[in-house]
């Protein structure tokens, strides 16, 4: 950040009075610019024990597999955002959303909130964001081509809970980027 969104003056990275973290502060008007984590919302859509996954058609990680998820928009509820992202990435409608997993991705300042849900019908198709969309069994999950660590964790938690026959709300965290193999 270089300039104040209130007055247009240059900002300085400094610790404001009565604070403990460096923030962008405008010396001209005194505005403190807080930068907070971004919320990513998504779904684990299921139809007859199969999970709907999509192959990314956009960067980052084009060509890798993921669950439908994306950034929450202003003025949108968390569940509505998860539904919208699922529709945008798969062309499908989901029902019976239940909050399932929250993952803090500390190093990139993101928080993921994933819902368990059902497909309203087995209707889905590729979209601008997904080059391929398909239902997969546990054995068909492309583990060697998962786009993001958070998606891998989500799938592992989900499959573990499904196998145990019991779901509860979970939390997890990712502190650092994956290391190259």
Where would I find each of the regions flagged by the language model?
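Acidic, metal-coordinating catalytic segment for phosphate/diphosphate chemistry
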Residues: 1-42
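Conserved hydrophobic/aromatic beta-strand scaffold that supports enzyme active sites
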Residues: 3, 23, 44, 53, ...
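Nucleotide phosphate-binding site architecture
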Residues: 5, 12, 27, 52, ...
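Short connector loops at helix/strand junctions that flank enzyme active sites
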Residues: 21, 36-40, 46, 60-62, ...
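Active-site donor-binding loop signature of nucleotide-sugar glycosyltransferases
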Residues: 28, 56, 69, 117, ...
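Conserved Nudix-box catalytic region and its N-terminal flanking loop in Nudix hydrolases
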Residues: 46-88
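Unchanged
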Residues: 72-157, 161, 166-167, 179-181
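Short, highly charged C-terminal tails/helix-capping segments
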Residues: 171-177
């Amino acid at each position: 950040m270089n300039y104040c969104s209130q007055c247009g003056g240059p900002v300085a990275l400094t610790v404001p009075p009565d604070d403990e973290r460096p923030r962008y502060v405008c010396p001209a008007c005194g505005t403190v610019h807080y930068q907070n984590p971004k919320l990513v919302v998504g779904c684990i859509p299921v139809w007859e024990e199969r999970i709907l996954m999509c192959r990314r058609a956009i960067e980052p990680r084009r060509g890798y597999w993921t669950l439908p998820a994306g950034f929450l928009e202003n003025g949108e509820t968390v569940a509505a955002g998860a539904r919208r992202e699922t529709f945008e990435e798969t062309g499908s409608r989901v029902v019976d959303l239940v909050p399932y997993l929250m993952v803090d991705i500390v190093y990139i300042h993101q928080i993921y909130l994933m819902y368990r849900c059902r497909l309203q019908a087995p209707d889905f198709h590729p979209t601008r964001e997904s080059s391929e969309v398909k239902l997969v069994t546990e054995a068909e999950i492309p583990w060697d081509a998962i786009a993001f660590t958070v998606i891998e964790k989500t799938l592992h938690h989900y499959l573990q809970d499904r196998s145990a026959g019991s779901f509860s709300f979970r939390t997890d965290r990712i502190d650092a980027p994956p290391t190259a193999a």
